[in-house]
Amino acid sequence: MTTIATGLRLALVVAVVTCVSAQNSSPSAALRPLVLTGAIPLPNVQGRIDHFGFDPNRIFVSALGNNTEEVIDLGAQRVVHSIAGVATPQGVVYSPETNKLFVASAKGSVYIYDGTSFDLITSIDFHGDADNLRYDGADKRVYVGYGDDETAAIGMIDATTNKRLDEEFQLGAHPESFQLETSGSRIFANLPDSKQIAVINRKTHAISRWALTLQANFPMALDEPDHRLFVASRTPPRMAVFDTDSGHMIAALPCVQDSDDLYFDSARRRIYVAGGEGYISVFQQKDADHYQILAKVPSSLGARTAGYSGKMGKKGFDRLYVAVPARANHGAEVRIYTVQD
């Protein structure tokens, strides 16, 4: 009888410990919104890596410190071409209608390449720090953020003719990330030097400005249907949410330091923020006014730029691509994080 009672007590203890252990481990298992599933080496790439561009089967990576634009085939998961001679490349966009690749240089030019051969078609001089690029497929226009102080503006290129348009929007401070409305006429632009967000009406050319209490606002994403703008700041490190109608800040949550790219996953109502601190901040949008931190996904020190554009490639997986600069113990690479529901 004593042996039986002892066995029962032991079984009960094991069951309780197992239950508690399962309860403690289940949240971390459930909260894995991003899973590292691969990496694509960037051979011979040194220095800082800047922004990403996409077409349905390729990724374009601006290797700023290497003066190259790297072309990755998603199916093969390897670099298939390296465009040399691009002085400090920053923003990059692909125009599917014209099969052209546009690459912005910190030296002031935008280079235009054939999207198949990658032969240089022409370059356009914007006279200072051509940075972020955005493409409007409806008008076949490439929007270019460029300049400093008096020259700072968002200009435009006709993707069909390869000509710079006379029309531009003067801002008085260098624009970092900016987003275009697709169903409206506004552009939202981060102006970290003036601690503002500029709101540009493309039809009337009117520009309003939202003053910020946060500083160093670089990356940005737009949830157009819900009228929400997501902005990451570096001082302090925050992911802030703004009402695009009123300019009012709805929320501000702590996030990764040294952020440079931010994306909104409309299917899962999530925000991904990549930062040089060495992880990716993932937030959940509970509704348009309420947000919570979902996970801190490890990446690598200095990995502050990323690319996300929803389902891509033949398999149709949602993936976040994170640029990891070369270090003494490893080469440069693009890490692949598969998005989990």
Give the positions of each predicted feature.
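Bacterial N-terminal signal peptides
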Residues: 7-19
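N-terminal secretory signal peptides that target proteins for export/translocation
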Residues: 1-6
